Amino acid sequence: MVTCVPASEQVGCAERDSQVYCEDTGGTEAVRVTDCGSPEDSGPQDEPSYCNSEDSGQLMASYEGKARGYQVPPFGWRICLAHEFAEKRRPFQANNISLSNLVKHLGMGLRYLKWWYRKTHVEKKTPFIDMLNSLPLRQIYGCPLGGIGGGTITRGWRGQFCRWQLNPGMYQHQTVIADQFIVCLRRDGRTVYQQVLSLELPNVLRSWNWGLCGYFAFYHALYPRAWTVYQLPGQNVTLTCRQVTPILPHDYQDSSLPVGVFVWDVENEGDETLDVSITFSMRNGLGGEDDAAGSLWNEPFRLEQGGTTVQGLLLHHPTPPNPYTMAVAARCTADTTVTHTTAFDPNGTGQQVWQDLLQDGQLDSPAGQSTPTQKGEGIAGAVCVSSKLLPRSRCCLEFSLAWDMPKIMFGAKSQVHYRRYTRFFGSDGDVAPALSHYALCHYADWEDRISAWQNPVLDDRTLPAWYKSALFNELYFLADGGTVWLEVPADSLPEGLGGSMRQLRSTLQDYGRFGYLEGQEYRMYNTYDVHFYASFALVMLWPKLELSLQYDMALATLKEDLTRRRYLMSGVVAPVKRRNVIPHDIGDPDDEPWLRVNAYLIHDTADWKDLNLKFVLQIYRDYYLTGDQGFLEDMWPVCLAVMESEMKFDKDQDGLIENGGYADQTYDAWVTTGPSAYCGGLWLAAVAVMVQMAVLCGAQDVQERFASILCRGREAYERLLWNGRYYNYDSSSHPQSRSIMSDQCAGQWFLRACGLGEGDTEVFPTLHVVRALQTIFELNVQAFAGGAMGAVNGMHPHGVPDRSSVQSDEVWVGVVYGLAATMIQEGLTWEGFRTAEGCYRTVWERLGLAFQTPEAYCQQQVFRSLAYMRPLSIWAMQLALQQQQHKKSRRPSVTQGTGLSTQPECGPKRSLANLNSE
């Protein structure tokens, strides 16, 4: 019999209304977190100096246990499972728009409503941005499982499987109750403790013992790994579940695998021998419509290779258009026993499974496959690993979760695509056992490689603990951004495609095609104005994927789609895509991306001022960091073409482009008129980069032409926009023209990242750049929300946020990280960390938006666009820090390991053009 402690007698769990096992362990103490102090306490300094303690603050205040878990690292995002976030925000909606801004967007709103109705009710499709059905606040998410491009499954910090992206780019935010871990402890042949390791109290599977006491458990995330520590009160047992996903920089094989591993370290701190088992239950599908078609079935499997045996269950889910097989598996060792239950009803009481475990801590392991389900019927299975545990000892129980969806179709269902991992495992849909076996045999090597990559940052005592968490945990989006990584068959690239791009075919065929969404709510692949910020993570960690993406973007640039459509903001009818301009995005996963680009329907982005410039800047940055001369030569004609397209925006021939009097750049609801700090700065930076590329490509006439433009443009930029403290937002007569834009130095940011922007290659006067950054810090950061929420996009000189648009008074997390990188580049290191810290603490510690970092939030009440691409720009901070550590005469280059090495013997610095001479 199992001993149950009534809720009224439980320590720290008095409010719960079901039986759970939370006996007082006696002498428990709360986790103490050393106070590192505030940067304000010590004042500005040249280098940050922070202590290396746990940085969990209030997130661990509810923890009543004393267990620290087995080999849980000191750095990361740590939260007690009983924690409740006090602040409950809501997504941005129309009623959050001021009356003046509502009037400005009335036409757009009416056109959007008409388009939304046709899309949802006539076409039966989901809008690429659904402004009427934003994702609600759910403060539950943790590290996703799965490598890059094979789909992801997110496990929440309380242990729930709650966010699914198996169909490419399409998300289902649904907690599946049957997907659980169960622990069973036996002493002297009797089960003394059996508990679902979940805080849930569901109305299904009611025979199971739910309602784990969260006060004795905590979660710790350091992506791509996570740890959950459970102290089992009264049992002298601590469980540490380590979740491992193969996110491996510079690896283009294992990083693509759709797998995750759960390693359970069970510590027996008592004086009695224990029999312990962990059971992993999993539903076939997600329930509801996902199961409605029926014909789902499970079967056991056993695979022995190379002296290692893995066994478990296959959950076959043949529903079109993207059928898949899920595998729940465990490693068999001399010290463990693996058993299973092939099928049970996830909507029933669960009594059969529960009683089976109670009897002997194992499952009955029936042979053969289950009967296929009827329409609407659910099915689940479970795998159990058990072992004997001596007093004062530890055992290790290993599970894997793999899913095999080799062939995919996007929403248009017009083409079949093969995921990257099929190159290594095959595409017949029968490799889930092999994936499971591979994961369980290789995860230790993955962890060694992850540690070798992360440790230089984690061991750096000059870096604050919050930054170490942010840098790695924000990388979740590279896998969980609706990401696809596809094979590119040879016959899909016609001979004439790409013209003179000699490396295009080999790059795409060797490294595949990569796509990630602008955001989980903004469903467009490779949104380029945002990738400008996020791309630092990709080029530093998987540079070949960045180059592949750039080749795809170059191909799309050279094409046109003259299909005419009405744009929602202006109401103007214009083509989908014009030749020789960078597309906004590569397409919608609910359509046919790469075939039909520019899913973005709000503006005609052919007239945007930033896209072409961002392409040129990224091409040079990617060349600079990779040293790939062939890539630069391939992209040079495309850069010439897009810059030629950009020339028409310099209407007065003063060397500086003008914005068009509407929101014609990444701030797509913030009107810009005439020469502007943001687009003008990007323009000058792109022109400067064209001068450098012309030298490298031996195009002297082009070099002279752009050098002349740069000379005139620099003078116009300073004359029209510099006011002595910062660069004006734009040069119009509008009241907001003197706003302080936090992103005004974006051009300088990229120049510095490319080893330019100072000395002979100076474009913006260094004193002006530093003064502008100081002004931004004083007003956009320190004068906004007490300096604790990052930098507001726009601020009036008298210290009031610019509310002239719906975006000017927002904080954009990815922009703030880029701003912080710029500050670090210019020697304002303390200010940079202080600025970025406000965003991290707001998102991860205050708002409860871990692993769903939004594009934006306001000072109060709202956030916008959860799980967004742009915050990957935090890797620009890391690049700036690493570049700081290198001598001026050396060039950073992406290599195996942490991201950069110095190779002074090669690279573009051999032939830099002097930008300060005619």
UniProtKB/Swiss-Prot annotation:
Its localization reads:
Endoplasmic reticulum membrane; Golgi apparatus membrane
How does the activity vary with pH? Optimum pH is between 6.0 and 7.0.
Q: Which biological process terms from the Gene Ontology are attached to this UniProt entry? A: carbohydrate metabolic process; central nervous system neuron development; cholesterol metabolic process; glucosylceramide catabolic process; glycoside catabolic process; lipid glycosylation; regulation of actin filament polymerization; regulation of membrane lipid distribution
Q: Which domain of life is it from?
A: Eukaryota
Tell me the Pfam families matching this sequence.
DUF608, Glyco_hydr_116N
Return the annotated region ranges for Disordered.
886-918
Catalytic activity reads: a beta-D-glucosyl-(1<->1')-N-acylsphing-4-enine + H2O = an N-acylsphing-4-enine + D-glucose; a beta-D-galactosyl-(1<->1')-N-acylsphing-4-enine + H2O = an N-acylsphing-4-enine + D-galactose; beta-D-glucosyl-(1->3)-O-lithocholate + H2O = lithocholate + D-glucose; beta-D-glucosyl-(1->3)-O-chenodeoxycholate + H2O = chenodeoxycholate + D-glucose
Q: How is its activity regulated?
A: Enzymatic activity is dependent on membrane association and requires the presence of lipids. Inhibited by N-(adamantanemethyloxypentyl)-deoxynojirimycin/AMP-DNM. Inhibited by its product sphingosine/N-acylsphing-4-enine in a feedback loop. Also inhibited by other non-acetylated sphingoid bases and their derivatives but not by sphingosine-1-phosphate and complex sphingolipids.
Function of the molecule: Non-lysosomal glucosylceramidase that catalyzes the hydrolysis of glucosylceramides/GlcCers (such as beta-D-glucosyl-(1<->1')-N-acylsphing-4-enine) to free glucose and ceramides (such as N-acylsphing-4-enine). GlcCers are membrane glycosphingolipids that have a wide intracellular distribution. They are the main precursors of more complex glycosphingolipids that play a role in cellular growth, differentiation, adhesion, signaling, cytoskeletal dynamics and membrane properties.
Question: What is the recorded name of this protein?
Answer: Non-lysosomal glucosylceramidase
Q: Which organism is it from?
A: Mus musculus (Mouse)
